[in-house]
């Protein structure tokens, strides 16, 4: 039984150390039968083990671990280890794409972050800085002194208030923009209010001559009624109203007030029922013209808009007045 062991031993072992370690195990009488059975049973695996052993020395002989186990009759653990190692490599070779898993996790994180951003609808903003009353007081004081801070001043102010330079800079920017808006708002109503004042100035002036005429002439209502009727027939005298108003005061002092009645007598050919009411205000007509004489300096621009009130003066055209004495 020992004879067949001899040829098997060199086939299983390539190193001298392993052979020396095997011989004592074979010579043990109690284990000889067990070793024989193990070796015969392993004869079928001899080719496989020989291949592994041949690969083992070629790959590296520094670890002679598989050879002693095969020599000692433990073929299954090495086969199991080899097969397991092969299975391990084979089974985990595809998942060896662990970097893709990491990438997937990273992409998941990115997607999560993207979802958070998309869920918010906008990017996260920094919280708004809340200034204390003391800080605002100091900032406003400094802003009243100067609207722009130099770098050293800004650093000093930020350090004294416990703020960052960026916060101080942004506060001053916002304060300057607010100040400009306030200035524009203050200037806008000023210009607009100036126009109503300019436009409102003539209104009192316009009312004052009316009141004066109404006070100067008790029959002003009749005069105001007559111009309303005389406006349609003659609009041409309106441009001559201004020169006549300036010239008319010159004639009444000369005692030409009686001839002023003649134009009214000549003009009423348009309307015959109006001369009687018009004759009554004629005597005070010079006095009425004297009142506008004193106020003609203020309301010359107003006469264009209120021609009907001065219509009785154009009736005293210088041409008619001068022609009447000649006749």
UniProtKB/Swiss-Prot annotation:
Composition bias type Pro residues, residue spans: 276-286
Biased composition (Basic and acidic residues): 266-275
Renumbered residue ranges of the record's region Disordered: 181-303
Stored Pfam families: Homeodomain
Localisation: Nucleus
Tissue specificity field: Expressed in the embryo in limb primordia of the head and thoracic segments. Expressed in regions of the larval leg, wing, antennal and haltere disks that form the distal-most regions of the mature structures (in the leg this corresponds to the tarsus and the distal tibia). Found in the optic center of the developing larval brain.
SUPFAM superfamilies in the record: Homeodomain-like
Record feature DNA-binding region, as residue ranges: 124-183
Any one Gene Ontology cellular component term annotated for this protein: nucleus
Gene Ontology molecular function: DNA-binding transcription factor activity, RNA polymerase II-specific; RNA polymerase II cis-regulatory region sequence-specific DNA binding
Residue ranges of coiled coil: none
UniProt keyword annotations, A-Z: Developmental protein, DNA-binding, Homeobox, Nucleus, Transcription, Transcription regulation
PROSITE patterns the UniProt entry points to: HOMEOBOX_1, HOMEOBOX_2
GO BP: any one term: imaginal disc-derived appendage morphogenesis
InterPro entries membership: Distal-less_Homeobox_TF (IPR050460), HD (IPR001356), HD_metazoa (IPR020479), Homeobox_CS (IPR017970), Homeodomain-like_sf (IPR009057), HTH_motif (IPR000047)
Biased composition (Low complexity): 231-249
Main location: nucleus
Function: Transcription factor that plays a role in larval and adult appendage development. Specifies the identity of ventral appendages (including legs and antennae) and suppresses dorsal appendage development. Involved in patterning the distal-proximal limb axis. May control the adhesive properties of cells during limb morphogenesis. Also has a secondary role in the normal patterning of the wing margin.
Name of the featured protein: Homeotic protein distal-less
């Amino acid at each position: 039984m020992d004879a067949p062991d001899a040829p098997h031993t060199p086939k299983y072992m390539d190193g001298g150390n392993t052979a020396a370690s095997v011989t004592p195990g074979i010579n043990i009488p109690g284990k000889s039968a067990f070793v024989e059975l193990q070796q015969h049973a392993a004869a079928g695996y001899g080719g496989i083990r020989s291949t592994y052993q041949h690969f083992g020395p070629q790959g590296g002989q520094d670890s002679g671990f598989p050879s002693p186990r095969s020599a000692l009759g433990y073929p299954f653990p090495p086969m199991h280890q080899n097969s397991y190692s092969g299975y391990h490599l084979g089974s985990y070779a595809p998942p060896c794409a662990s970097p893709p898993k990491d990438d997937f996790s990273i992409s998941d994180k990115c997607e999560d972050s993207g979802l958070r951003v998309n869920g918010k609808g906008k990017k996260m903003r920094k919280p708004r800085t809340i200034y204390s009353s003391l800080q605002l007081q100091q900032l406003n004081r400094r802003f009243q002194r100067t609207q722009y801070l130099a770098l050293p001043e800004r650093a000093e102010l930020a350090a004294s208030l416990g703020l960052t330079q960026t916060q101080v800079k942004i506060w001053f920017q916002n304060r300057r923009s607010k100040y400009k808006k306030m200035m524009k708002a203050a200037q806008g109503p000023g210009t607009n209010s100036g126009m109503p004042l300019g436009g409102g100035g003539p209104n009192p002036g316009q009312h004052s001559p009316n009141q004066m005429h109404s006070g100067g002439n008790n029959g002003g209502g009749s005069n105001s009624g007559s111009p309303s009727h005389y406006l349609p027939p003659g609009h041409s005298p309106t441009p001559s109203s201004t020169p006549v108003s300036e010239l008319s005061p010159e004639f009444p002092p000369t005692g030409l007030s009686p001839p002023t009645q003649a134009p009214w007598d000549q003009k009423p050919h348009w309307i015959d029922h109006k001369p009687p009411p018009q004759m009554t205000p004629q005597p005070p007509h010079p006095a009425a013209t004297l009142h506008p004489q004193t106020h003609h300096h203020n309301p010359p621009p107003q006469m264009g808009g209120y021609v009907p009130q001065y219509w009785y003066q154009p009736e005293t055209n210088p041409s008619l007045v001068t022609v009447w004495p000649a006749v």
